[in-house]
Amino acid sequence: MTEALGRSFASLSIPNFRRYFTGQLVSLSGNWMQMIAEMWLVLSLTGSGVAVGATTALQFLPMLVFGAWGGLIADRVPKRRLLLLTQTLHMIAPLTMLALALQGVLAPWMLFSLVFMRGCVNSVDYPTRQAFVMEMVGSERVVNAVSLNSVLVHGARVIGPAFAGVLIATVGVEPCFALNAASFAFMIWVLAGMDTELLRPAEMATREPGAVRAGLRYVRRTPELWIPLGLMAIVGTLGYNFQAVLPLLADFTFHGGPSTYAALVASMGVGAIIGALINGARSTVTPMLLVGAAIVFGILSLVAAGAPTLALEIVALAPLGAATVTLAASVNSSLQLASEPSMRGRVMALYSIVFLGSTPIGGPLSGWLSQAVDPRAALVMAGIAAIVGGLLARIAFDRVAQIPPDAKLEPA
């Protein structure tokens, strides 16, 4: 038991990663507070599930459009220096929202514009953060570090909504914006204080025409990359839309307020933390783990869709959260391990595109389905998509296993 726990937290023995872990927990908690405030504010101002879905879409549309170039920037610029810039730019949106909200003039179109701007910064920031993990811990601990990264992401999903639910219900949305801006300032301090001598910087990509296309060709000829990416594209588009579905589930299905929404998000977060800690004890990722995680995620989505009461929904979302993080962390780790260092930024940008950038398609679809039918219908869609995606990935892995080792399989 003690040995397993030690393996789960092994990467925290590295000073830079330990410092980064702390900074990200604070920063991501602030980010979740802001996202909860944004979603509830849009729902309060418009009463529209489509508007909530559109807000989610605007946040991630830049990743879909610009993500590949964001990954190229991550391959060409020292990652710590680039993160210092993106964290500074990330402070602009919450400070602007705070000023507008305090003046009582924050309209939906203003919020949409600022959410889109934050998404543009994130199209560079997200793939850079993913690739930077390898530079802090090395290949021997990247699976553990990615899992611990998932722990802090979903720990923030518990902490942020819990604080946001209390603040919105008692004071309003303004403190959420202020605390998020402060959290980015803390992350800047964390990055600036790292011991650069302990980092393992990847080889910088050469500046040549067609570098983005070269990254796409590299993924296309590498089954260990395109199969997990294809699986995540399916599940990411149709399944990972909880930012749009959960506020509608809280409001339309269970007739609750911000505290109900926060409870649903926190339940998924608790389950995700447990799942990430279990996943962190592994040192490798197998194809069957990817397939199994997708199918289990699909089954648990269908279970959550059938929960008849709020209490049972909260219970059902916890194991769904564990399955969510197991699939995402397993795909992330497998891509990091299979990528060449000079291509890692572009590969992780493609992961970012299918994981987050697919939301502009899935977010509005889930929002529309939730409003036109029921939020449970969006969970049914997620479940079916994940099961189908897992089965397709199994078929693809079986085909690859039949190819001689010196041959390459490219998708048709």
Where are these regions (language model features)?
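Alpha-helical transmembrane-bundle signature of multi-pass membrane transport and export proteins
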Residues: M1-A412
